[in-house]
Amino acid sequence: MTTKINNEHKKVYVPNLRFPEFQGEWEKCKLGDYGKVVTGNTPPTKDIENYENGTYLWASPADLGTIKSITETKTMLSAQGFSKTRTLPKGSVLVTCIGSTIGKAGMATKEMSTNQQINSIVVNDNNDNEFVYYAIQSAFPRYLSSIAVQAVPIISKSAFELLPNNRPYLQEQKKIGRFLSMLDERIATQNKII
């Protein structure tokens, strides 16, 4: 997605393909620069009232990776259970950071929470959440090649925050995010037809 040019030891990051109205370098950043990183948690499972008649979304790795927008989850929480979690606002970007599904991602379509296998970015006002989702999806294979090999792959919250990325200014982020979202929607529509 990017071209690296080394001119007197200066690395310049610009995309190979770009909307014509944008120019200039992309800024080097870390995932933590996109917003606040939140690791999920699990309400006590021994207390059935945390889950009984649940209406609140609570994502686990099984809920991520097939579609971008998280509109339902396999496990739902009651109001009591939800109050015991770290809540995420609509638009947060969710990424599995432990286990065989590491790197699977999704985006919150409404306020929700996750279990501890997921790190989420509550995207700040200086960044576009759609762009952040696609930037992480694009870079994750590179991240996987750099993590330590172990029986259960894991990226801790602190390591996740430090993963490198590149970003343009907000207006370009928004245009890229909208464009890629539109492509995803068209692909999904075509898949339904087929």
Residues of each region from the PLM?
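Amphipathic alpha-helical segments with low aromatic content
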Residues: 1-27, 168-194
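Proline-centric
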Residues: 2, 20-25, 119-129, 141, ...
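Short beta-strand/turn micro-motifs at beta-sheet edges
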Residues: 4-6, 106-108, 148-153
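A short glycine-rich beta-alpha junction/loop motif
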Residues: 11-15, 97, 112-119, 149-171
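Non-catalytic DNA-recognition/assembly elements of restriction-modification systems
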Residues: 16-42, 66
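Localized chelating/binding microdomains
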Residues: 27-34, 134-138, 165-168
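Short coil/turn segments at secondary-structure boundaries
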Residues: 44-51, 149
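A short beta-sheet element
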Residues: 54, 60-64, 71-140
